[in-house]
Design a protein with these regions (language model features):
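Conserved phosphate-binding elements of NTP-dependent enzyme cores
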Residues: 1-941
Length: 941
């Protein structure tokens, strides 16, 4: 084959890559696999993608490059055959509450266009279909409806507004008009005429009064034109005999009430535009309100004793004097328990009073009484929530607030006008609320309900929407709705949305690199995902997938296996070829694929401790009033297809309930009826995949707390004592022992103006982070900088005789992180690695045997061998009497559980039910849902 048929990588040395060469066939689906830390991402993202991106940026002008990010050249000799590269990672980078599935995929933009062009408007006052006319149509209607009748032609000038309108009447009089209709009454305009300025008024000028002739009337035609001009496109007809009113407009207008709408445009249906957003919540669908139950948590107490949480116990302060004076009129005092106060009194304490309150002179030490208005505790908290309040004050005020659905738009995000445009009885929000499956079905059938005009307008728009929805269905996201917030999506979901968007873009000759797209996918949906990737390939693209999934590897055209181990012991290509060739080799990956190695099914399932937590009546999101038992002392696995309600049940209902109980967490759980059995546990630990820290200074040593022990060890050394060093001397975060040239970072950022910033090792400390004196203190010949540069495996050997340090480092090795460095920046760790650092930190703490651990997809980023190691760790926890709940799709984990809770049967609205529960063997026999079928195959039943 010619070289151009391959992407060739020569001499890659990024991170732990050992000067490797790799050959990847173009226009094929290639899987890069291997143990965690073996160099998969280093090859795919940090070498191939980084070089592709750098070359793309180099095509820009120097001026344009100045505004782009830092793009260092990866440490590689050369790469040939590279196409333009698009990376689709699993990071959920979008934290914007305004971003939704619909806006990300641009499907909502097409829906806005559809409603602006083909939507039918209805009045939000009367429910009548809105109409708009030309002047000729208005003339014909008047001749038809009022033939032979005496009518007044009116032009509306003021619509329900306060004012005396003296100047307006004078202007009308000067134009030669003699009459106006004010608040439904026709009046002659007199000199100096004015209205009550404090009341709302409707004012129309009488353009003409006439009897409608039987034939076309020139006077009527002129009067209609004048009325339209004076009324800015609106006019009214008053029947002199019946006094009934009809409205006419060139704009969209309700014929009954005269309500008019702006001409619809796509931005009128956008919740991110002032023209379309709900005015109350500004298009967010939720508002922040003060929660009275958080302000007054204990009604047994009096205000004096601290019943009002924001105020605390009584102190000599104006607000307490005001409340005391306010309560006097209810024959109560500050020492009256809240539960004995009348509701009116509590309302005034919270929301203030219009009355002026008398503060006695004896309280404030003045010669006379003092009168003030009292604005209430709620107003006081709201003031601290304002933008100009300090961050500390805002954070303090937040604890008394709760996020509730906007009372005006009911969570729809749009204003009343936008919500009253319909297509086949559905407004745009109702479509955005449907799950993608339901929406696709609705759009496939909607043609038969459209008028010929609507069909002609919407044919191309509908085609685009259907195509994009089909791609979302193909990647297993049928359970999502378009209005689902991007913030609430998992990494796997947001990655698959970006994948669907890319398939929809129809690009060719592109290299796509994906990071574990199967994350969060049930086995049922895996085949659809694989077919989507093949579709991307068949369009003429190259697809590289970093993946551990067995089905994905076997479906690939080409597999590259990195290894043989992780970290320093990895970074080599141990196999490259077709999946069939791989099955005949003896790499660790191939042994798991061909069955020589496997994760064994436990000989027996644990019985637990006989106690349980019962969660009853869970109704959050799509949960259908489920009652779930969590037997304690077991490894519990929560399963089900994507969107079936697993995360809602565990992460959004159970975990917040437990966090509120044990740690007074401010996160509110979703709706449920009751929970029983909390006395059977004394601690809950949620081990998630969020980064360890917000800065590059955070690392495994600082997060686990072992760095403090290491610093104390160095402080106790004779050399450190002679020099009088304290623990701060060995910290790179504070002045004293760190290198001040780079402030302890180990590198300096060089701004290149017209080129990307360059990160160079600090020329003073050479990347060691410390000044010259600090590393002179050595333990076993190693300085503290050397210790931070050690891998966990090396550190375990080094500190084998220091139990306090060894215990904390050993657990990092036990969870399969022996290859990472003690001082490795947390920003370079993957989500799965961060989760395991947190798990190790919890393992190193003393447990009580009554702890509940919650893990969401702990196998993310893990090879078969890593999963075996991780399961060993989790089993140790359970063997000590603790309970572990994992949300998981991986069958190797599911088959090792003591107890399974299977949710489903489908995702979204079709899910939310408890299908089966019990041991894997019991669940495998269930006829409901998809999990039992795959479990039967795995267990060999």
């Amino acid at each position: 084959m010619q070289e151009t048929e391959y992407i060739n990588v020569y001499g890659a040395r990024v991170h732990n890559l050992k000067d490797i060469d790799a050959e990847i066939p173009r226009n094929s689906l290639t899987v890069i696999t291997g143990l965690s830390g073996s160099g998969k991402s280093s090859l795919a993202f940090d070498t191939i993608f980084a070089e592709g991106q750098r070359r793309y940026i180099e095509t820009f002008s120097a001026y344009a490059r100045n505004f782009l990010g830092n793009l260092e050249r990866p440490d590689v000799d050369k790469i040939t055959g590279l196409s333009p590269v698009i990376s689709i990672e699993q990071k959920t980078t979008n934290k914007n509450p305004r971003s939704t599935v619909g806006t990300t995929t641009e499907i909502y933009d097409y829906l806005r266009l559809l409603y602006a062009r083909a939507g039918v408007a209805y009045s939000y006052l009367s429910g009548e279909e809105m109409v708009k006319y030309t002047e000729e149509q208005i003339l014909d209607l008047i001749l038809k409806d009022y033939k032979g009748k005496k009518i007044y032609l009116l032009a509306p000038l003021v619509r329900s507004r306060k004012g005396h309108y003296r100047e307006l009447f004078e202007q009308i009089r000067k134009k030669g008009y003699l009459y106006v209709r004010v608040d439904g009454e026709v009046r002659e305009i007199t000199h100096g005429m004015k209205l009550d300025r404090y009341k709302n008024h409707d004012v129309e000028v009488v353009i003409d009064k006439l009897v409608v002739a039987e034939k076309d009337d020139r006077r009527l035609k002129q009067s209609v034109a004048t009325a339209m001009r004076q009324g800015d496109g609106l006019m009214m007809i008053l029947d002199a005999q019946s006094e009934s009113i009809r409205h006419y407009s060139k704009r969209l207008m309700c014929p009954v009430t005269g309500l008019s709408y702006r001409e619809p445009a796509p931005h009128n249906f956008s919740f991110n535009s002032p023209q379309g957003a709900c005015p109350k919540c500004k298009g967010l669908g939720v508002v922040n309100q003060i929660d009275v139950d958080k302000v007054i948590p204990d009604r047994e107490l009096s205000i004096y004793e601290g019943a009002i949480a924001p105020l605390g116990k009584y102190k000599n302060a104006m607000i307490f004097w005001q409340i005391g004076a306010l309560l006097e009129k209810y024959d109560a005092t500050l020492k009256t328990p809240i539960k004995e106060l009348p509701d009116d009194a509590i309302d005034e304490v919270l929301y203030g009073s219009d009355e002026r309150i008398k503060i006695k002179s004896s309280l404030i030490g003045t010669s006379s009484d003092y009168f003030v208005t009292y604005e209430g505790v709620v107003k006081y908290i709201q003031m601290l929530q304002e933008k100009d309040a300090s961050a500390i004050a805002q954070k303090w005020a937040e604890q008394f607030a709760k996020t509730t659905v906007c009372p005006e738009c009911k969570g729809a995000r749009l204003n009343k006008e936008a919500l009253h445009f319909r297509i086949h009885d559905k407004n745009i929000n109702e479509l955005a609320n449907m799950d993608i499956n339901e929406l696709y079905d609705w759009l496939m059938k909607v043609d038969e309900f459209l008028s010929d005009k609507q069909k002609k307008i919407s044919v191309e728009i509908l085609k685009e929407i259907r195509t994009r929805l089909k791609f979302l269905l193909d990647v297993g996201l049928d359970y999502l709705a378009l209005n689902r917030s991007s913030v609430s999506l998992s990494g796997g979901e947001s990655q698959r949305i970006r994948l669907a968007t890319q398939i929809g873009s129809q690009l060719v000759n592109v290299l796509y690199i994906l990071d574990e797209p199967s994350i969060g996918l049930h086995q049922r949906d895996n085949l659809r995902l694989i077919n989507s990737l093949k579709e991307l390939r068949d369009m003429g693209n190259s697809v590289i997938v970093v993946e551990h999934d067995k089905d994905m590897m076997l479906a690939a055209d080409y597999v590259i296996d990195m290894g043989p181990k992780a970290g320093r012991l990895g970074g080599e290509v141990v196999f490259a070829g077709t999946p069939q060739e791989m099955l005949n080799t003896d790499t660790m990956t191939s042994q798991y694929l061909n069955g020589k190695m496997k994760i064994e099914i436990p000989a027996k399932r644990r019985k637990g401790n006989g106690k349980s937590i019962w969660l009853k009546g869970a109704k959050g999101n799509n949960l259908k009033n489920v009652d779930v038992e969590f037997p304690l002392g077991k490894l519990i696995c929560v399963t089900g297809v994507s969107g079936s309600g697993k995360s809602t049940l565990i992460n959004e209902t159970l975990q917040p309930i437990l966090s509120q109980k044990f740690y007074r967490s401010l996160q509110d759980p979703l709706e449920y009826d009751s929970i029983e059995g909390l006395e059977n546990i004394d601690k809950v630990v949620d081990v998630d995949q969020s980064p360890l820290g917000r800065t590059p200074r955070s690392n495994p040593a600082t997060y686990t707390g072992v760095f403090s022990d290491i610093r104390n060890l160095f402080v106790g050394l004779p050399e450190a004592k002679i020099r009088g060093y304290k623990p701060g001397r060995f910290s790179f975060n504070v002045a004293g022992g760190r290198c001040e040239a780079c402030t302890g970072n180990g590198y300096k950022t060089i701004e290149m103006n017209f080129l990307p910033d360059v990160y160079v090792p600090c020329e003073v400390c050479h990347g060691k982070r410390y000044n010259r004196e600090t590393p002179e203190v050595r333990f076993k010949g190693k300085s503290i900088a050397d210790v931070l540069d050690m891998t966990i495996n090396r550190a375990v050997e080094f500190f084998e005789n220091v139990p306090q340090i060894l215990n904390k480092i050993k657990v990092l090795q036990d969870v399969g992180l022996g290859y990472i460095k003690l001082g490795q920046s947390s920003t370079t760790l993957s989500g799965g690695e961060s989760q395991r650092v947190k798990l190790a930190t919890e393992l190193s703490k003393r447990d009580t045997g009554k702890t509940l651990y919650i893990l969401d997809e702990p196998t993310t980023g893990l090879h078969f061998e890593d999963i075996r190691v991780l399961m060993g760790v989790l089993n140790k926890l359970v063997d000590k009497g603790n309970t572990v709940i994992v949300i998981e799709h991986n069958l190797d984990v599911i088959k090792m559980a003591d107890y399974i809770i299977d949710m489903g049967p489908e995702g979204g609205k079709g899910g939310g039910e408890l299908l089966s529960y019990g041991t894997p063997e019991e669940v495998a026999k269930s006829p409901k849902g998809y999990t039992p079928k795959f479990l039967r195959e795995e267990l060999g039943l």
